């Protein structure tokens, strides 16, 4: 029997990350019968340090560095690709690495989750001073804009840990906010009380999609990934990431997006919001382009929207954000 070719997949060790790695494994193995994909799960700094809010880390390498080191190992721990939640991938990767592909996006929205048995079904029903748990300043800033009567506090941990904290009878949280996609991929759709629409909350860049990181110029991996990645999602997410990169915002900065690509008209619509941490100042603009060259036009769309936002005060908002980061 002919031995199979091996493509080693790396990912974080959380339950959700393992599910995501397994999804990519299935995609590749179902397209290529001669390939098998063993999985390697790794604890990253972001997994290990649970006592600090995410914004204090200052950047996204907190989720990626340990895995990136394995792409260039010369022993049995070497991997060929890394599966990330795209929203956690830095928009500027270190030398020697590149974004090899983006999978089809599932629901990109943010979700409100109430404790089991809660009498409430929306933020507008909560009593003044109720505590909302979220690890994201993007979420808390946008919600403060709409619900200044509520309090927002950090909550860390994987999805199961956060849900356990929420459901604890002694919990300080009246509700928490999570990515809809993470709940769906974890089989926890039933915990979603409400999905926020774009009027209330723009989602994170890349949210709901998986980004696959590879060694730079690894043509073999590029050919494999081309077969499992989604063109429409790629167009939207390249534009979103270009916007974020041009504005120089990391995952710790309140920048939200909403994007849509119409395959029939080839029109890409990208909306961006830059908002201060307090939710009192913001700039929100929508931009449309017709796509002819998928990569080039998508990236330019993000750059053009970034320029519009900057012209309307986004830079001043971002410059005013002074967060206490880990040095």
Swiss-Prot record:
Going by the entry's taxonomy, the superkingdom of the source organism is recorded as Eukaryota
Q: Which cofactor does it need?
A: dipyrromethane
Gene name as annotated: HEM3
Task: Show the GO cellular component annotation of the record.
Answer: cytoplasm
**Free-text cofactor note:** Binds 1 dipyrromethane group covalently.
GO function terms (MF aspect)? hydroxymethylbilane synthase activity
InterPro entries per UniProt: HemC (IPR000860), Porphobilin_deaminase_cofac_BS (IPR022419), Porphobilin_deaminase_N (IPR022417), Porphobilinogen_deaminase_C (IPR022418), Porphobilinogen_deaminase_C_sf (IPR036803)
* Transferase among keywords: yes
Q: Which organism is it from?
A: Kluyveromyces lactis (strain ATCC 8585 / CBS 2359 / DSM 70799 / NBRC 1267 / NRRL Y-1140 / WM37) (Yeast)
- Name-wise, this protein is Porphobilinogen deaminase
Give a short account of what the protein does: Tetrapolymerization of the monopyrrole PBG into the hydroxymethylbilane pre-uroporphyrinogen in several discrete steps.
Another remark in the UniProt entry says: The porphobilinogen subunits are added to the dipyrromethan group.
Q: Which NCBIfam families match?
A: hemC
Q: Does the keyword section mention Transcription?
A: no
Q: Name one GO biological process term.
A: protoporphyrinogen IX biosynthetic process
Question: Which family does the record assign?
Answer: Belongs to the HMBS family.
Q: Which Pfam families match?
A: Porphobil_deam, Porphobil_deamC
* Record field: catalytic activity: 4 porphobilinogen + H2O = hydroxymethylbilane + 4 NH4(+)
Give the sites modified to S-(dipyrrolylmethanemethyl)cysteine. 251
Per the UniProt record, which EC number(s) apply here? 2.5.1.61
So, what pathway does this thing act in? Answer: Porphyrin-containing compound metabolism; protoporphyrin-IX biosynthesis; coproporphyrinogen-III from 5-aminolevulinate: step 2/4
Keywords for the protein's UniProt record, in alphabetical order: Heme biosynthesis, Porphyrin biosynthesis, Transferase
